[in-house]
């Protein structure tokens, strides 16, 4: 059962606990160049067979999975409007004001959709999957509830063998403060992707996002561990899993499974063999949230492009 907690419930929990015990995870370093610490990241060619080493086939990977292992295909959404918007502002203006707004001049980055470039990136990925000999077709599909990931799933998998994806709350991006991490309500999402399914307990309103606090890397790691536990529990017999999500939560997933850092461009994907161990470990939660002051430690006297004065508090 998913340990699915709203922001309010999480706050209550953190007042009485600084750690949560969840399964320990590990990842294989055998099959993929991205996973091999002996291969410098700069020398990894993940455009060739998604990084699968030449001495192995996809069948080698899947047929040799242990009973507690699965092959995860972790996919980052294509470029969204929130990825390009910050280039129009100074870093301090973006962090202290514009990131919290819904958009500007007709460009919406709140729960951002894909840019034309982002659509093309995912069309290219779709073709790469289609052209990859013996590509292991996922047996279960999971996706973040944000619009850019829902679009990405549709463009990637429509026209390829697939099953109905399950929308997972904890597959979302690091959330809080900035508007790009705030999801639409459940009714909107259903109308946006009517054929998708929601996990049990998915709330109508976004009860996790807050305008005042953002989850820390520590909390993101905890959430990644919960997400993996859910997927392993929901997929006892499936060996190949697809998850469409975001760079922040992907990095947390890699951290939790002991995988080295690997940069993920928009529209990218990384295959990872992940094992769930038969024992638990403690995930610390003593520093679970960042505040607006962490985002904007030195507010400017004014924000470019607005009449806003942070000195007077007007907005």
From Swiss-Prot:
Residues 287-315 form a propeptide. Its main location: membrane. It comes from the Eukaryota. Residues 1-19 form the signal peptide. A lipid is attached at residue 286 (GPI-anchor amidated asparagine). The record marks 246 as: Transition state stabilizer. Pfam families: His_Phos_1. It is found in: Cell membrane. GO terms for molecular function: isomerase activity; phosphatase activity. This is Phosphomutase-like protein 3. Keywords: Cell membrane, Glycoprotein, GPI-anchor, Isomerase, Lipoprotein, Membrane, Signal. The active site is at 77 (tele-phosphohistidine intermediate), 173 (proton donor/acceptor). It is a lipid-anchor; GPI-anchor. It comes from Candida albicans (strain SC5314 / ATCC MYA-2876). InterPro entries: His_Pase_superF_clade-1, His_PPase_superfam, PGM_Phosphatase. Gene3D superfamilies: Phosphoglycerate mutase-like. GO terms for cellular component: cytoplasm; extracellular region; plasma membrane; side of membrane. Belongs to the phosphoglycerate mutase family. Glycans are attached at residues 88, 154, 185.
């Amino acid at each position: 059962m998913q340990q699915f907690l709203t922001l309010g419930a999480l706050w209550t929990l953190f007042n009485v606990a600084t750690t949560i015990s969840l399964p320990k995870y590990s990842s294989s370093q055998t099959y993929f160049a991205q996973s091999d610490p002996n291969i410098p990241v700069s020398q990894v060619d993940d455009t060739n067979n998604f990084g699968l080493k030449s001495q192995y086939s996809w069948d080698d990977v899947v047929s040799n999975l242990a009973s507690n292992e699965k092959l995860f295909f972790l996919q980052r959404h294509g470029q969204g409007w929130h990825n390009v918007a910050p280039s129009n502002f100074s870093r301090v203006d973006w962090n202290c004001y514009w990131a919290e707004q819904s958009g500007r001049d007709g460009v919406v980055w709140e729960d951002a959709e894909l840019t034309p470039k982002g659509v093309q990136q995912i069309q290219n990925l779709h073709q790469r999957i289609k052209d990859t000999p013996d590509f292991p077709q996922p047996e279960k599909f999971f996706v973040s509830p944000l619009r850019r990931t829902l679009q990405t799933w549709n463009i990637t998998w429509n026209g390829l063998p697939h099953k109905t994806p399950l929308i997972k709350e904890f597959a979302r991006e690091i959330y809080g403060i900035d508007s790009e991490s705030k999801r639409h309500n459940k009714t909107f999402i259903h109308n946006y992707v009517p054929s998708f399914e929601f996990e049990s307990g998915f709330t109508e309103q976004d009860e996790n996002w807050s305008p005042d606090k953002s989850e820390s890397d520590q909390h993101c790691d905890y959430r990644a561990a919960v997400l993996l536990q859910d997927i392993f529990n929901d997929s006892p017999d499936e060996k190949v899993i697809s998850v469409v999500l975001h760079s922040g939560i992907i990095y947390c997933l890699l951290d939790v499974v002991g995988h080295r850092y690997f940069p993920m461009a928009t529209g990218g994907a990384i295959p990872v063999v992940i094992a769930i161990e038969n024992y638990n470990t403690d995930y610390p939660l003593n520093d679970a949230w960042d505040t607006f002051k962490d985002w904007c430690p030195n507010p400017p006297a004014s924000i470019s492009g607005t009449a806003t004065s942070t000195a007077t508090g007007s907005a």
